[in-house]
Structures are given as C-alpha cells and as structure tokens.
C-alpha cells in the first residue's frame, strides 16, 4: 500500500529516481525525488500540487518542497526534497522506501 501523491487522493504512477544523503552522525539526512513526466503534470490533470505525500500503513510523510522542471515552457518533471532531522525520521523514511521498493520491484544501490 506504499504510494506517493502530489495531490491528496491522486496516486502518482511514475516511479522516481531517489537520491539519499546522510550526515556522518546519522542524525540527519536528505532524500531527493526526481520524477520525469509525472502523471500529475498531464494535460488532463487539473489537480493542484500541494506537496509530496509518502503514504503507507504507518501513516504519511509530508514535504512541501516540490519544484517543477520546465523545458521550452512545458512541464517535464518534478523534484521533491524531504529533509530528515532525526534518526527516527530517517528510520521511518527507510521503512517507507522498503515498502515502496517491494511493491514496485525496485532495487537499491550505493554510489
């Protein structure tokens, strides 16, 4: 049931590229989600982007830091950043990502 939404009730079908950084102490971290041609930007969609909602059986994680990418005046993508300010937020995020990856047949690789 792990899903991502940009507008409540409208599940995003495009699978993002996710980049993670974490402090040396493990207390803070950042997740950057890059969506190429997400469903929310389709011409027929009239919903407003109100944030990025990561929803699973534990609840939801919310970030309001969502930016659009435009090429020649047309929307081409979205970038959302979620900042984790504690080890507990990091662990919660990782649990969500494990569920999301399992449901979408995704893998994880360290760079």
Swiss-Prot record:
The source's domain of life comes to Bacteria
- Assembly description: Part of the photosystem II complex.
User: What membrane topology was assigned to this protein in its record?
Assistant: Peripheral membrane protein
Instruction: Give me the gene this protein comes from.
Output: psb28
Predominant localisation class? membrane
Q: What is this protein called?
A: Photosystem II reaction center Psb28 protein
Q: Which Gene3D superfamilies match?
A: Photosystem II Psb28 (2.40.30.220)
- Please name the GO terms of the biological process aspect recorded for this protein, alphabetically: photosynthesis
Coiled-coil stretches = none
Fetch the PANTHER family from UniProt.
PHOTOSYSTEM II REACTION CENTER PSB28 PROTEIN, CHLOROPLASTIC, PTHR34963
GO CC, alphabetical:
photosystem II oxygen evolving complex; plasma membrane-derived thylakoid membrane
Q: Which protein family is named in the record?
A: Belongs to the Psb28 family.
Species the sequence originates in: Nostoc sp. (strain PCC 7120 / SAG 25.82 / UTEX 2576)
Localization per Swiss-Prot or TrEMBL: Cellular thylakoid membrane
Sorted UniProt keywords: Membrane, Photosynthesis, Photosystem II, Thylakoid
